[in-house]
Amino acid sequence: MKSLLKRLIALAAAYSVAAAPSFSHHSSQDAANKRELLQDLVTWDQHSLFVRGERLMIFSGEFHPFRLPVPGLWFDVFQKIKSLGFNAVSFYTDWGLMEGNPGHVVTDGIWSLDEFFTAAREAGLYLIARPGPYINAETSAGGIPGWVLRRKGIIRSNSEDYLRATDTYMATLGKIIAKAQITNGGPVILVQPENEYTTWPNVSESEFPTTMNQEVMAYAEKQLRDAGVVVPTVVNDNKNLGYFAPGTGLGETDLYGIDAYPMRYDCGNPYVWPTYRFPRDWQHEHRNHSPTTPFAIMEFQGGSGDGWGGVTEDGCAILVNNEAVRVVYKNNYGFGVRVFNIYMTYGGTNWGNLGYYGGYTSYDYGAAITEDRQIWREKYSEEKLQANFLKVSPAYLTSTPGNGVNGSYTGNKDITVTPLFGNGTTTNLYLVRHADFTSTGSAQYNLSISTSVGNVTIPQLGGSLSLNGRDSKFHITDYDVGGFNLIYSSAEVFTWAKGDNKKRVLVLYGGAGELHEFALPKHLPRPTVVEGSYVKIAKQGSAWVVQWEVAAQRRVLRAGKLEIHLLWRNDAYQHWVLELPAKQPIANYSSPSKETVIVKGGYLLRSAWITDNDLHLTGDVNVTTPLEVISAPKRFDGIVFNGQSLKSTRSKIGNLAATVHYQPPAISLPDLKRLDWKYIDSLPEISTEYNDEGWTPLTNTYTNNTREFTGPTCLYADDYGYHGGSLIYRGHFTANGDESWVFLNTSGGVGFANSVWLNQTFLGSWTGSGRNMTYPRNISLPHELSPGEPYVFTVVIDHMGQDEEAPGTDAIKFPRGILDYALSGHELSDLRWKMTGNLGGEQYQDLTRGPLNEGAMYAERQGYHLPSPPTSSWKSSNPIKEGLTGAGIGFYATSFSLDLPEGYDIPLSFRFNNSASAARSGTSYRCQLFVNGYQFGKYVNDLGPQTKFPVPEGILNYNGVNYVAVSLWALESQGALIGGLDLVASTPILSGYRKPAPAPQPGWKPRRGAY
């Protein structure tokens, strides 16, 4: 048996190491192909980054400040990411939102990054800045401003008119980022120019990048360098082909990174895991592409999204759930990833029409942190377990990944084991998963490995290990627990910490009912059980071996100064590892030299510090919650939670404990259907008296668009400066009596709709689908027209956002508006067209809320969606009880006050439903929801899927007056009413979060040039 075991271990190691050479430690700035560094605070070798000389695993979460337009809440999100055990955040900035007006980059109010940088520094998170200029990110046009779309040059090419268009924005953002670099005491440690720049039409993978593509990347890098950016640059190659890696020439970046989404996007079938993108050899790919830099994944799938007519983000959360996190994230660790960014960790909201047509208002993304900033999804806790393990495992950072081989180390071909071999350390790590990673079945196995006490097969005390369906585990050997050697453990490490008086506390966990085993050197005292039962302890050779079956009740053992907690995974979820503040310049940033506390504390613990004889904690609870200090670097006798001293006691094993009492607060929310609503017609354009003199005449006889127009003039909205929200066209003609039909081919993006009137006569609507970007149709005219009389078509089109694009395709330029038209009995030139979008187009007036927040509807052009419009002359009408009796657009407004209790985070949402009995609630209609001027919901009744629209505190005034407006667009002749609209609260959370200042909410005033 012993010889068979030796052969099995040797064979497994041979297979594993075959293509896994060890690298000698050297700094990449010494490599021949490495450019000279511009600073010395962020450096690297082939294994990892060094920040201020300390080797760090960069574990990052993606979070976009523009998707949460309340700067006072950014710190809350940062703290929740920090509490995951992450040490960084990656963020995009959206050029299209900041420079909607050419040459005018808005950087104040919600568009200022100052508070973002301050909050990151205070929370202790490094930042990876990604200013684009193209960002993708499910944003309209991928973040390219609408005015750039009408330029002749190909987007993302070296065309001079495109490159010059980026200059003002990149210079402005570059200076802002440069000021916030680590070299200036800020949090920014990496910068990414461009985004997923990896293809070009008619250029093969082997030919890419061409010189032109290299020039584009080099131009973006130079813009940043010229602005003062000195931290390393990084690329995110979504093809994983080595594009722009160090040493590749013009356009190369300092660090090479990839991005990948192996779980794909089928949120409608979330239990079916796709297999065709599951990676198996990334460690080799990286060695081929960039052997002198650490393996970096700059975007990895943290959720997914769906579109109009699809499913809600809940399905996306199931697709990339805690099981997927366990399997596919750990697969990445098997490749030795050392810079790891999860896209998204907090998604936020596509408010104000900022999204592309493939998504609805929510950008929850099924992420670990929900759109309304809650952390109840299990994958939040799973990510916390993983990040904290890697944080306390320096051996991982220099380990050499081997090959994952079916049957290696276990003899079970249904199981794949991927080793990571100690490279300068004695620690080896073994990642175990199903050979079929999608398997939902369970497998039994024994693990045969080499340790410092010889070759062993785990478990040694009988039984077998088990791997449940869609699971993956770290097994470790000769793992350093602050000077104590953990010879092996089949249970996973959550964390370990240094306590007072040279004590070490180790936390292990496993799944319910699993058999696990660990071993300690025999020179330690025999482990004793000080809490719990049913633990088997035996001496095997030169080791103490401990075996147990995971249960809800924890076990605690001691072996001299080493204390081991054996937890059920779901109990480990309730534990938090909090870094204590250090001296500058580390302060709240992560560092392997920092002291930590481990506290069992329920829903969320945010921060900790020790003063005198007290441990101060900030955190959140949603039920009465016991606190227990599992480990701390010094002894203290009191616990202060959110500024309140708690009654503390000592547990049987000597841990300090206390209880945070939770009392649900009394909450009073308005009944929206009982409020006094005011109404104004928002489609006066179909009245006989309407004068469109102030509208934009569509007289351009040319376009730079890749799609040629067919009429005498171009009708594309982008060519006239209108880029989002909604569009209204008016086509004037004089009748000749031969009119019987009109043909219209309209474009609004997937999910769009349109309605058409001839004078005051409703001709019908296209109500939209989850597939059509455009819709051509012939419309019969209902009656004969009077020859010689003037007529006008009014066409309302919903603008769902521009597309994203692969480089060079110019897909984002595909026009919105009327593409083609014809009128029977007439030449095309007989119709004279005008249009409007948002008031002023690119010269938009509400700089506070950005260029896309408004559309073409009359009430929006007048600014009536802003607080305190002149409603005294409007009639009273309720959109929920009364609504519209015919096709058209109504605008409804009301106000209410809130007075929610201090000290609680109370997520609020507006919820639409069509459960009312009135027939008109089941017709096709669309609503926009404006809250204190911000458009925070686009509701499509018959298409969906979104019915619930979270609105954060700071947009809603939790202690003050709120102005809410709803546009109601009835697409059918019988009209529409809103079946139901409620303001609802999620469970109030007793919170240590910082109450946010309201986002800027400038109110209504008469608008210059409004029509």
From Swiss-Prot:
Sugar attachment sites: N202, N406, N423, N446, N455, N588, N622, N704, N745, N759, N772, N778, N913
Disulfide partners: C267-C316
Swiss-Prot/TrEMBL GO biological process terms: galactose catabolic process; polysaccharide catabolic process
Subcellular location: Secreted
Its EC number(s): 3.2.1.23
InterPro entries assigned to the protein according to its UniProt record, in alphabetical order: Betagal_dom2, Betagal_dom2_sf, BetaGal_dom3, BetaGal_dom3_sf, BetaGal_jelly_roll_dom, Galactose-bd-like_sf, Gly_Hdrlase_35_cat, Glyco_hydro_35_CS
Family membership: Belongs to the glycosyl hydrolase 35 family.
UniProt function note: Cleaves beta-linked terminal galactosyl residues from gangliosides, glycoproteins, and glycosaminoglycans.
The protein's name: Probable beta-galactosidase E
Annotated source species: Aspergillus fumigatus (strain ATCC MYA-4609 / CBS 101355 / FGSC A1100 / Af293) (Neosartorya fumigata)
